[in-house]
Amino acid sequence: MKKEKAIVVFSGGQDSTTCLLWALKEFEEVETVTFHYNQRHSQEVEVAKSIAEKLGVKNHLLDMSLLNQLAPNALTRNDIEIEVKDGELPSTFVPGRNLVFLSFASILAYQIGARHIITGVCETDFSGYPDCRDEFVKSCNVTVNLAMEKPFVIHTPLMWLNKAETWKLADELGALDFVKNNTLTCYNGIIADGCGECPACHLRSKGYEEYMVMKGERA
């Protein structure tokens, strides 16, 4: 364990919760930051707060409602249908979201004396979001370091993991059931197994079933 401080970009979903559990194993002191941008499932904020409390971690909540105004899409508006069309970005793409989140997480890290910033983005289950790519995160890391003259390190523990491997990591951290039962991934705001219909639920459940097969608990 590194005797350093870290901050986790935290939504209360499967990926960011797994990253938080990973960070708690890796760093002596960990805090979280959650962004409220009037997202489609607003209970995300409450779920993040609840999980942070259960794990004994401080949660910072930042009001990013301007993002909703700037980037209306299916993730921020209930009247926009969730859909994925061939050759186009998904309707849930929020332009610049991770750029904004990592920038503000870095500012907060500067203020609280944290060198390490953790985010749950990944390329393997790439949903078509350009700001989930490894090259974007590395570029952002260089930018925030130059902007604040600090040696921040942005960690992406899930970058090269698919959903089955993300479940495996949660299991290795001793928290498979915790992640399965407490996190909110569903675009329709249903905790744990979700609605079973939206793209996020399909990806989550498919990964879980694949991991159960890998583990030998499914035929």
UniProtKB/Swiss-Prot annotation:
**UniProt keyword list:** ATP-binding, Ligase, Metal-binding, Nucleotide-binding, Queuosine biosynthesis, Zinc
Q: Which residues bind ATP?
A: F10, S11, G12, G13, Q14, D15, S16, T17, T18, C19, L20
Stored Pfam families: QueC
Q: Domain of life of the organism in this record? A: Bacteria
The record's annotation in InterPro entries points to:
QueC, Rossmann-like_a/b/a_fold
The molecular function terms of the Gene Ontology recorded here are:
ATP binding; ligase activity, forming carbon-nitrogen bonds; zinc ion binding
Q: What is its EC number?
A: 6.3.4.20
Q: Which cofactor does it need?
A: Zn(2+)
Q: How is the cofactor bound?
A: Binds 1 zinc ion per subunit.
Q: What does this protein do?
A: Catalyzes the ATP-dependent conversion of 7-carboxy-7-deazaguanine (CDG) to 7-cyano-7-deazaguanine (preQ(0)). Uses ammonia as nitrogen donor.
What family classification does the UniProt entry report for this protein?
Belongs to the QueC family.
Please give the NCBIfam families that the UniProt record associates with this protein: 7-cyano-7-deazaguanine synthase QueC
Per its record, how is this protein called by name?
Answer: 7-cyano-7-deazaguanine synthase
